């Protein structure tokens, strides 16, 4: 278990294609929205080697993570299809540049019927009030010599863990807002192995849970006043 001092940013997007419905037996009368997305999906699949890289945070990532299709039935040509894109951004990559990368994947011939859009957190509160927040958060990292990072490293030593450089998450945490947008000093430390996160092998060692609680109990005493 290491002290983590940063991770990549994130931008969530969708690309929606619109076509024309028809019976599958007369598909030549329709305009299949799914087919319009195929070259875009292929371009995204092949994009990752060209994404940004950083010596600490690592290489940018991109994934087509979901697809929704509107169709009268499974015996019809779908008239609308949407893919959802998860983009993990390293240092040096900007929101504008990421959006431009996806726009460039849309073939000129279908740009009138295929549109890119950012995603927002816009679920209503219990009162019905909606406060949209963009699903974009920049990459962030605090230096190894930051007082909070150093306090975390000291706490690891107090609980008997061998010295090791502070590292970074490969996935995203709430630090994307606290540190990435609000600039609040943040570090991470916890049980579990992120390599198995969101897999059938996702698990946490109980011994690591106990050791993590020791760290949390000690951390505040290591922060300089």
Regions found by a protein language model. Give the residues of each.
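Metal-dependent amide/peptide-bond hydrolase catalytic core
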Residues: 4-225
């Amino acid at each position: 278990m290491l002290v983590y001092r940063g991770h990549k940013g994130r931008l969530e997007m969708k690309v929606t294609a619109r076509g024309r419905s028809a019976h599958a037996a007369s598909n030549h009368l329709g305009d299949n929205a799914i087919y319009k997305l195929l070259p875009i999906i292929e371009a995204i699949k092949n994009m990752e080697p060209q994404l940004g890289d950083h010596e600490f945070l690592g290489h940018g990532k991109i994934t087509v993570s979901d697809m929704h299709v509107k169709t009268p039935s499974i015996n019809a040509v779908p008239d609308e299809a949407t893919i959802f894109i998860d983009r993990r951004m390293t240092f040096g990559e900007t929101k504008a540049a990421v959006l431009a990368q996806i726009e460039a994947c849309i073939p000129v011939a279908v740009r009138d019927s295929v549109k890119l859009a950012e995603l927002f957190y816009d679920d209503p509160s219990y009162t019905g009030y909606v406060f949209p927040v963009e699903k974009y958060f920049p990459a962030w990292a605090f230096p190894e010599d930051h007082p909070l990072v150093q306090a975390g490293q000291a706490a690891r030593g107090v609980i008997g863990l061998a010295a090791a450089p502070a590292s970074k998450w490969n996935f995203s945490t709430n630090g994307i807002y606290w540190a990435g947008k609000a600039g609040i000093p943040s570090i991470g430390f916890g049980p579990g192995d992120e390599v198995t996160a969101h897999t059938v092998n996702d698990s946490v060692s109980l011994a690591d849970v106990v050791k993590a609680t020791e760290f949390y109990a000690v951390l505040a005493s290591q922060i300089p006043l």
